Amino acid sequence: DELEELTDRIIQETHLVDDVPARLDLLKYSSVGVIGNRDKVTDLLKNILVSLSTLHFFRDVRIVGVFDPEEEEEWKSLRWLPHIWDDELQTRYLNFDPLTEESLASLSLNSEKGYVDSYAKFREKVNSIIAERKDPDFQAKWKNGTSPIPHYIFLFASRKKTECFLSMLSENDPAMGISTIFLYDEQYYLPNFCQYIVNVDDPYDDRTATAFYKYRADEKMWFTMDQPIPQRKFDAFCRQMSAI
């Protein structure tokens, strides 16, 4: 009938909407995988981080970055963001150290050599955050569906250095107040518990990406990525944010 035809026409006309921000809900989806061409993944994440750190006070949102040493030049500017520090402003939740035998050993074994591998110390710090957030006593303080503050966002760009954290994050429990973003080349490498996927590779348009809930891959959202932020401007932004 006419009403049904009108409905179909409206759906077709509004299938693509211009100038509307694409939303990535890190409270609804505790684990997100961003996959595809590494340069485009990097560009997208920089835009996300600029929006995130601009709109959220560093006491409300904390960022934890785990990267391989090869990407240090690309991401070392993050050290200026206030969101990357711990509560005491003594430790940055940012690591580029190589994975070594000492990193995989326990802290007690490393101490026999008179030092503790820097990645092992970083791992211990992050594990303590996760353990606290899994504690029922901690979660009891945040009732009625309220997310704990600060909300932690883990950026996992190193597959090997990420493995030691996966078992503690696999529940996707919103009560923990932790979201994870995995930056991998292919969907195949994402952990099984990853809920939401953003694919930056589109065969027809270099600036188009798709996003979808893992178990509803047929219901994809297409969006146009923002223009890349030059490294110089990204560094300048992070340095300006350090004054907050």
Annotated model-derived regions:
Residues 1-244:
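Accessory regions of macromolecular translocation/handling assemblies
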